[in-house]
């Protein structure tokens, strides 16, 4: 099975298995944000043969998706005007010399959390998402490096692979590890 078909199968799994207490991406604006990726962020970063893979924590909240439909999010899968997205794109260019489109980017938690963007997602839910979606995406894409944006993302991936979980980013950043042929790194978000 090709990488594209394997990733599409994971997207289909995500669509069919929305956990209790969360919403699916298709539940907003008549499905305008839905896609055939695990995360809509991949719309702009879906290089299946990427050397660099990015894993962000979560894609959206109920509050943010309940606002009027955003054409940028529909087409790109993210808001280019947000400072975190501008910073990420600049850092990719500065440190790797690549645009976002040369990466494979996804979210650890591919469902819509209730509340606002700072609403808490329990660790057990992040772990379930890592096992069912993030780790399989890493295995399919098989990049040289995965950059986990944020300590919770890095620690969830680490724990799901039975690796130590650092207490803070200062400890996490130098403590990358190898999973199969891929190095997993932590970085601040």
Task: Name every feature range the model reports, one short phrase each.
Residues 2-147, 151-164, 183-188:
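A polyanion-binding, active-site-adjacent surface
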